[in-house]
């Protein structure tokens, strides 16, 4: 029985994103996306003029959803900024690994090196997404300086960019190692950089 959905464009994005998260962009053909979404080719091209433009829309959708999730984690009531930031980094460990220890979620990790030389629109979409993520982190760090949960360690945007790059690299190593050791090391480095106790 065909599943019911009202937004065909979003349905195609959701189905394609699920496959591409597992297989990468180049490893997924248009027919596989059409089959998963159970839509004809004409419907796809009504919304996306090419697979590349679909990829751009998919990444923009991913970033929008990711930022919404990020806002929830960083805005938990009853937590100071330091606690919220460490909860955010903890989510990387819990969500970056599936049962076999393989990255299964982050499209930034999955696609950055693949699409950077393949598609300028997709590269720009990912780059814009990382800028927006770093901006969210910078706001959280600045809030920590106001609520006294973080010391005045560095310029918030610079610290946010450094931490994000640290964790992104750790997530990429996690794919190679198939364990959480790189993420655990990133956590310890984050605590040191933010001058937080190890039990934070």
Task: Give, region by region, the residue ranges found by the protein language model.
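Helix-turn-helix
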Residues: 11, 15-53, 57-58
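Amphipathic alpha-helical segments used for helix-helix packing
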Residues: 84, 99-121
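Short, basic, alpha-helical segments at the C-terminal edge of helix-turn-helix-like DNA-binding modules
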Residues: 60-67
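Short alpha-helical elements of helix-turn-helix
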Residues: 10, 14, 106-109
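Short amphipathic alpha-helical segments with heptad-repeat character
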Residues: 120-123, 127, 131
């Amino acid at each position: 029985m065909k599943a019911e959905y009202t937004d065909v464009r979003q349905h195609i994005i959701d189905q394609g994103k699920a496959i591409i998260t597992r297989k990468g962009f180049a490893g997924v053909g248009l027919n596989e996306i059409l089959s998963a979404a159970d839509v004809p080719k004409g419907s796809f091209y009504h919304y996306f003029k090419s697979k590349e433009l679909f990829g751009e829309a998919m990444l923009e959708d991913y970033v929008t959803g990711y930022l919404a999730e990020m806002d929830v984690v960083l805005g938990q009531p009853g937590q100071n900024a330091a606690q919220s930031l460490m909860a955010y980094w903890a989510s990387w460990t819990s969500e970056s690994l599936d049962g076999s220890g393989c990255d299964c979620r982050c499209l930034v990790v999955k696609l950055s090196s693949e699409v950077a030389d393949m598609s300028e629109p997709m590269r720009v979409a990912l780059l814009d997404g990382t800028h927006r993520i770093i901006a969210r982190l910078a706001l959280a760090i600045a809030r920590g300086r106001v609520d006294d949960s973080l010391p005045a360690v560095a310029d918030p945007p610079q610290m946010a960019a450094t931490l994000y790059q640290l964790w992104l690299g750790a997530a990429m190593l996690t794919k190679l190692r198939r364990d959480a050791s790189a993420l655990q090391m990133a956590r310890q480095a984050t605590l040191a950089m933010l001058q937080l106790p190890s039990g934070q």
